[in-house]
Amino acid sequence: GTFADVSEKSGILKSPGTYGLGVIVFDFDNDGWPDIYVANDSTSSALYKNNHDGTFTDIAIESGVAYSADGKPQAGMGVSVADYNADGLFDIVKTNFAGDTSSLYRNSGSGWFEDQTFQAGLGRITRFLGWGASFLDFDNDGWADIMLCNGHVYPEVGETAAESGYRQRKVAYRNLGDGKFIEASESLGPGVMEKAPGRGMAVGDFDNDGDLDILVNCVNDVPQLLRCDSSTKNNWIKVKTVGVK
């Protein structure tokens, strides 16, 4: 097969002058059609609603995911989606530049997202420059937790009260199951606390032991592969599919 560039025809080129750094495809309104969210740096982010005819419409502003809770554009870097409050709807977590918090948008189901960054407990940490973001259930309790990889863009940046230096540790939030999160970075071992110039992250069970592992790619450095050795008694399921001719 071949690919044709339909960017302009589809309508996603109608937002010039933006700096998209993170993107994810998901069905935010459960209509069976994939939509697109773009985390933009220094400008409003975009939520492209699928019009079911090969075109998209940016509805980020009216949906509440274009700006921060106080109406300011943020320097979005990475993005992930999951149903963190188990209501059947995809929610959004977004990393931002240093001096700002990450963003957590809860899907209300009515076409509107509510900024729950501070209410959920993600509004206290601002020293890190976030890149990769992943919803993942790192303790297999059935609730989507959050992992963020970080690293500054300027090697000369030193560690201060406001900045965490060039090489930065990961930040992990444990989902308490009541709409709130608590930072759990230190409890997850030295691999999470090890500092690196992180730029992106992927999650998967690479050793097939039932818990999720993390791969962090770094700029001008080797990647980090963090194997999860869980001591939890919680459950997981493995499915083997068999093809039929």
Name these PLM-found stretches.
Residues G1-K245:
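Acidic, glycine/proline-rich Ca2+-coordinating loop motifs
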